[in-house]
Amino acid sequence: MSIKTIKYFSTIIVAVVAVLAGWWLWNYYMQSPWTRDGKIRAEQVSITPQVSGRIVELNIKDNQLVNAGDLLLTIDKTPFQIAELNAQAQLAKAQSDLAKANNEANRRRHLSQNFISAEELDTANLNVKAMQASVDAAQATLKQAQWQLAQTEIRAPVSGWVTNLTTRIGDYADTGKPLFALVDSHSFYVIGYFEETKLRHIREGAPAQITLYSDNKTLQGHVSSIGRAIYDQSVESDSSLIPDVKPNVPWVRLAQRVPVRFALDKVPGDVTLVSGTTCSIAVGQ
């Protein structure tokens, strides 16, 4: 066999191998369930005061790890302690009035019908009921005052990291207005966005390999759930409630991306997870 013939067949073999390799790579890219568009996520808990007041104690700093139940901050207790004392006094007065009304009603019940009318007896009994209602209201007011006093101590509802802390001692806390957030340390998960053409290769429970962009470390996880709805950008509704269908190019169709949620099987101690950072995901590996 001549050298020319060998070169000819060698060129053909190399070309065939290149075509097959290109086809395999293209098929892997288009069909294999993997994506570079993955995000680390975690649940965040807003720390929101239930009462208003000046912050007199702050036991945390930004990015600090806290445990569930730890005291985070304290709001000035003085006005709530005064409210509790006032509620206790109101309850004592209501109980005294009730005792007085009971004594009067009992006295009238033992009087002869010649000395008291049925109307007067009914009035005494109704007065007892009214005083009992006052006692119940005073007890409710006291419970509310005690609850508000307890809310001046804000504790961590979950274990996690303090984030976006700009609050300082002396700041005024408003009821219902978040002060900062806690990133739940036990809630980390991964969201991957996959083309719809790859969903047929993804099943709940399937293993996945998750590579962090931050330090190139690889974690193991599995498919937790698959999104069931995405926004349709092709249709909009106007004021006349008639669908506004956007025109498109018939021969160009972009695959929609669907969110898939992954649970992390185990996170090594030397891995730092940061919610919002990027990762790549390969399913079935």
Swiss-Prot record:
Keywords: Membrane, Transmembrane, Transmembrane helix. It is found in: Membrane. The keyword Repeat does not apply. SUPFAM superfamilies: HlyD-like secretion proteins. One of its GO terms (biological process) is response to toxic substance. GO terms for molecular function: transmembrane transporter activity. It holds the Pfam family HlyD_D23. It is a single-pass membrane protein. Belongs to the membrane fusion protein (MFP) (TC 8.A.1) family. NCBIfam families: RND_mfp. This is Uncharacterized protein YdhJ. It comes from Escherichia coli (strain K12).
